[in-house]
């Protein structure tokens, strides 16, 4: 019974998708410098947790997947113009609730600071008078803009195009801390190894949820994707993909 129900749900999803996206291509907009959610691997291929989920959703909907790298600060223009169908790349719902048609939240996240281990900084309050770097138009930048007391205590708040640059600046001593998503921070620290960096977890800047952003009003495609993600949660696919990238299940869809 559950199998036939899932099959019926999948068929309905495909019908909805065909109605809303005639070319049969599922175009995913993402920041290609945002590992582990979406990035370019050592072989020059697009990969990442979110991109792997998106590919499986497209497959189940009978659509062709297309990965479309975008400038993160141009994401709204990209989706409004129809260049992409979704923004799926560690995309925070919090603070953007009315800007897009949203999927169900599929992950929880926090905004935190990363510092060099040898900096001597162990608490957020010790960032007073320090240089802090954050990605332009990111959730971290928005969270700091809303916490003026904290951001005004810094000597300088610098914006950068991507987090690879931010980590280079941190390593060279050009900045004292980087504000970023804890999910991404954990991956970066594991990848870079050697215990060179630490996450300041005593006082998160903000707590938030990740979702998939669709053009406002595109509820048919949103509903098809949501139904497919519920399917993937039920059959264990979300869990297995999550464990591949994070060694644990970080997803929240039931």
Where are these regions (language model features)?
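Extended ligand-binding regions for polar small-molecule ligands
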Residues: 52-60, 131, 136-138, 211-248
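Bilobed "Venus flytrap"/periplasmic-binding protein-like clamshell domains
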Residues: 32-35, 46-59, 91, 112-164, ...
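Periplasmic-binding protein-like
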Residues: 32, 108-115, 182, 186, ...
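Extracytoplasmic small-molecule ligand-binding "clamshell" domains
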Residues: 12-90, 224, 235
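Short helix-initiation/N-cap motifs at beta->coil->alpha
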Residues: 51, 66-77, 157-172, 208
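A ligand-binding cleft/hinge motif common to bilobed small-molecule-binding domains
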Residues: 74, 90-99, 143-148, 171-172, ...
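Short, low-complexity disordered leader/linker segments with a strong preference
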Residues: 1-25, 250-254
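Acidic, polar ligand-binding/catalytic clefts
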Residues: 55, 59, 64-126, 203-204
């Amino acid at each position: 019974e559950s199998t036939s129900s899932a099959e019926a749900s999948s068929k309905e999803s495909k019908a909805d998708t065909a109605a809303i996206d005639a070319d049969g291509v599922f175009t995913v907009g993402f920041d290609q410098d945002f590992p582990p959610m979406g990035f370019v691997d050592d072989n020059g291929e697009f990969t990442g947790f979110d991109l792997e989920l998106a590919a499986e959703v497209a497959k189940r909907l009978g659509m062709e997947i297309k990965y479309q790298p975008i400038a993160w600060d141009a994401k709204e223009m990209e989706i409004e113009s129809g260049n992409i169908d979704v923004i799926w790349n560690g995309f925070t719902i919090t603070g953007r609730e009315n800007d897009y048609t949203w999927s169900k939240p599929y992950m929880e996240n926090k905004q935190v600071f990363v510092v060099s281990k040898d900096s001597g900084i162990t608490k957020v309050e010790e960032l007073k008078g320090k240089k802090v770097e954050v990605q332009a138009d990111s959730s971290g930048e928005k969270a700091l803009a809303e916490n003026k007391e904290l951001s005004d205590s810094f000597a300088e708040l610098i914006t950068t195009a991507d987090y690879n640059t931010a980590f280079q600046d941190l390593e060279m001593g050009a900045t004292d801390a980087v504000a970023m998503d804890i999910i991404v921070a954990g991956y970066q620290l594991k990848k870079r190894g050697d215990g060179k960096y630490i996450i300041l977890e005593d006082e998160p800047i903000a707590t938030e949820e990740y979702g998939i952003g669709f053009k406002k009003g595109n509820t048919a495609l949103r509903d098809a994707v949501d139904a497919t993600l519920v399917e993937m949660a039920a059959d264990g696919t979300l869990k297995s993909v999550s464990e591949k990238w994070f060694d644990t299940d970080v997803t929240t869809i039931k």
